[in-house]
A protein has these predicted regions:
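Conserved alpha/beta enzyme-core scaffold
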Residues: 1-318
Length: 318
């Protein structure tokens, strides 16, 4: 509605879905729609290329001075990593919470020094709906088989050794591959040095079972990951620390493995994660390009067909 009436004329995001994606794809947006990776977005903000006039940041808890945390309230999301760049560089910052707590709300994920206003509302969201769609573990036999193939590739590569590092996407097969990998790690007595995420329960289970030294977290995709934030070896990192290609050190460049999903993969190994075969914007690239560029071994899990549409093709849609 706001795109069609001209209220919104430009969009910068890591991806869009649903009616917004349809509106952009149909040419209803008057200006540009720029799709950036997680690292690309924070680079644009920190470099000044993207100027934010005002940032509205949903935070599960906040004190009256503006110290924000992703836990401790009724709508916990875990960490606030992707909002940190906005808070640090926007001209004005508004923290929106449904749980106002006593000062000081420490350790703060976003500091009071960056927040101009605190607004209290009845509800900022429903944490029960955090794990939906792609972020749910799969029970599909085909995807479980794909996950097993992926795991076999990982464990037979030269990078699978004590102290390796690892990240998966949130596709069902990617999540399942972590479960099967954990079993082989236990059998071979191999320990992971660090796991990176977007995190889900299987990765957090590695921490609980003492199969990984530390987790580095930018986003939590289920309630188990949200709860895991309380673990002293579960560290939050900013989007800049995670994947900004222009800073002096990004975590993605220290990855051994990254397991990703895709809408399409072509015969030249190009991947499309944003646009459907019908030309509609229907997904988000997130950290896909960042991790694929940084990791020693990037693995993309995709079926031959997505429904009735070929996922393996001569040329990707985009």
């Amino acid at each position: 509605e706001y795109i069609e009436d001209g209220t919104i004329t430009r969009i910068e995001s890591s991806g869009v879905r649903g009616k917004i994606g349809e509106a952009i794809s149909q040419g209803k947006l008057k200006g540009l729609a720029i799709m950036r990776s997680h690292g690309g977005r924070v680079r644009a903000i920190e470099s000044g290329e993207t100027q934010i006039d005002i940032a509205f940041i949903g935070t599960p808890t906040c004190d009256e001075y503006g110290n924000c945390r992703g836990i401790g309230g009724k709508s916990d999301c875990g960490v606030l990593s992707y909002a940190m760049a906005d808070a640090y560089h926007a001209d004005k910052v508004v923290a929106i919470t449904d749980t106002l707590v006593q000062f000081p709300n420490f350790p703060a994920h976003i500091s009071m020094t960056k927040v101009d206003y605190v607004v209290v509302v009845d509800e900022i969201g429903n944490p029960q709906k955090i794990a939906t769609g792609a972020a749910k573990p799969t029970t599909d036999m085909r995807k479980l088989m794909m996950a097993d193939y992926c795991t076999q590739f990982v464990v037979n590569s030269p990078y699978f050794k004590d102290g390796f590092s690892y990240q998966t996407g949130v596709g069902g097969a990617s999540i399942a591959s972590t479960i099967s990998l954990a079993k082989i790690m236990k059998e071979r007595n191999i320990r992971m040095r660090f796991g990176v995420g977007g995190l889900t329960k299987p990765m957090c289970d590695l921490l609980i079972n003492d199969q990984v030294d530390v987790l580095l977290d930018t986003q939590d995709f289920d309630l188990a990951a949200v709860e895991s934030v309380k673990n002293l070896r579960h560290f939050r990192i900013s989007a800049g620390e995670y994947a900004n290609p222009f800073n002096k050190g990004a975590v993605v460049n220290k990855l051994d493995f990254v397991i990703l999903a895709a809408l399409e993969v072509d015969v030249n190994f190009n991947c499309n994660v944003v646009v459907g075969s019908d030309g509609m914007l229907t997904g988000a690239q997130g950290g896909h390009p960042d991790t694929a560029a940084g990791a020693k071994c990037a693995i993309v899990i995709a079926p031959l067909l997505q429904g009735r549409i070929p996922a393996i093709c001569t040329d990707v849609t985009t």
